[in-house]
Amino acid sequence: IAQKRIPPIVLIQIANGGGDAQGHQRGREYDNMSGLFAEYIETEVLPRVEKAYKLKLTKDPEGRAVMGSSSGGSASLIMAWFRTDLYRRVLTTSGTFVNQAWPFDPKYPDGAWGFHKTIIPNSPKKPIRLFISVGDRDLLNPNVMRDDMHDCFIALH
């Protein structure tokens, strides 16, 4: 920033809703397969930040990024996927791309788990730049999930 290679950055961090998985506020906010959370951020959170800190945030989706870890990582991709008019840069660290969506949506029966299996492969290309960071010790977990838990990386190439 000091060398003017990138513009100033405003980082806004939001705590997730309570509980975990289906039936809880967190599943409603972070894991629903729609643009609702992005719309909430756009219409409720960002205007309050602009007013409280006397800022003018860009509306240009090329100048915005969304990021998160765990459920926040999947929420970040969901926000950009369904609202490319708002976000086109995504950073997800150890994103939990699982099915915790609530309420159930028959259009996306696998929730975020469907990104690598059906959603990305069966969709037109989107103007999203995606950075994914994950650990490399998943297979040491004695509770390994389904066999195709790593196919997300194949689907995203």
Where are these regions (language model features)?
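Non-catalytic cap/lid and distal C-terminal segments of serine-dependent acyl enzymes
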Residues: 1-157
